[in-house]
Amino acid sequence: MLLNEMVIDENNMAFIPSLGTSYQLNETAKEIIDLIKEGKSKEEIVKIIAEKSGKSWRDVYIDVEDFFQKLKVYGLIQ
């Protein structure tokens, strides 16, 4: 999984050395990536972010699912 190679700096700039690609992340994207790297499931990630943000579980699930799909499109997760 290429996501495990990703290095994120203090400005939320993510870099994947083997591909030579970089991405600008917002705070939520960085948090999701960090949680994925910790081995959290999608459902655990949704729960954590919903609790922190005060948004409904359903709304957060939709956003997290969309982000997971983007990670798949970019080939960062399977």
Placement of each model-derived feature along the sequence:
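Acidic, low-complexity/disordered tracts enriched in E/D and polar residues
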Residues: M1-K37
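Long, charge-rich, low-complexity alpha-helical segments
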Residues: Q24-Q78
